[in-house]
């Protein structure tokens, strides 16, 4: 079975557009779980423009399913200018205090709108390996955000990480435009084969939707997808519970 982890960032972004607690993040997490989601994902950025530090603690206190926190493990503390928002403690400090089921490590910068590339482990491999070991010593499963590059995936295995998450934007774009789709899809098939051969668990995410997900879900070895933006958009017209159920069907598990 391929697990569906629902990313709540866009729901938090709606909340933060007003000075309010609506939509309530834990309540919407529970709605997703009740509808069949296998896990919950958040990506608290240093500016806390969507998910906030307090959301992470609120979710950790109530979740009985997999809790996946994404972020750059090299990002340190950040002060906030708002009196009603806690300072960002740094990714590793947050992970150590919460101890989620899984940490997905992502090499994003403060100024990025969204995650847009995987790790370059030729450059950062030694540092990433130390951070992976630090998280694993706390009982946290680790996953590295990676491009579908066999050489980089082999380097990921050398860090000792439990899993990788394939960055799927190039597949989603090729599916949308039709440009070189078969070639791009086979890149992901090959990347998955290398990951499995290296003993890595395989996750995937970014711009997966109800149209492109069924084909991607045929890739052997895929264990989990993390989906937020498109699921939230579909929830506007379908309702959240029906959207979660639709994504489970697209994975072949609903």
Model feature map: region roles:
Residues 110, 141-194, 198:
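Histidine/lysine/aspartate-rich catalytic loop segments that bind and position anionic ligands
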Residues 7-13, 45-47, 70-76, 108-110, ...:
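Active-site beta-loop-alpha junctions enriched in small/polar residues
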Residues 117, 176-181, 234-254:
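C-terminal helical cap(s) of enzyme catalytic domains, especially alpha/beta-barrels
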């Amino acid at each position: 079975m391929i697990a569906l982890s629902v990313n709540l960032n866009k729901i938090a972004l709606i909340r933060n557009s007003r000075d309010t607690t609506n939509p309530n993040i834990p309540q919407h997490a529970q709605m997703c779980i009740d509808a069949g989601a296998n896990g919950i994902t958040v990506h608290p950025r240093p500016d806390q423009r969507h998910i906030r530090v307090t959301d992470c603690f609120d979710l950790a206190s109530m979740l009985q399913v997999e809790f996946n926190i994404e972020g750059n493990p090299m990002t340190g503390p950040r002060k906030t200018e708002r009196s009603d928002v806690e300072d960002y403690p740094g990714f590793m400090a947050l992970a150590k205090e919460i101890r989620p089921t899984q940490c997905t490590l992502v090499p994003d910068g403060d100024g990025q709108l969204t995650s847009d590339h995987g790790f370059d482990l030729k450059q950062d491999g030694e540092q990433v390996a130390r951070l992976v070991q630090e998280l694993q010593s706390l009982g946290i499963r680790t996953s590295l955000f990676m491009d579908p590059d066999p050489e980089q995936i082999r380097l990921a295995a050398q860090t000792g990480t439990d899993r990788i998450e394939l960055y799927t934007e190039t597949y989603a774009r090729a599916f949308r435009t039709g440009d070189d789709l078969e070639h791009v899809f086979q890149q992901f098939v090959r990347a998955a084969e290398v990951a499995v051969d290296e003993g890595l668990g395989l996750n995937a995410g970014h711009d997966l939707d109800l149209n492109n997900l069924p084909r991607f879900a045929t890739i052997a070895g895929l264990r989990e997808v993390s989906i937020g933006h498109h699921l939230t958009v579909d929830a506007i017209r379908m309702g959240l519970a029906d959207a979660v159920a639709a994504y489970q069907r697209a994975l072949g598990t609903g």
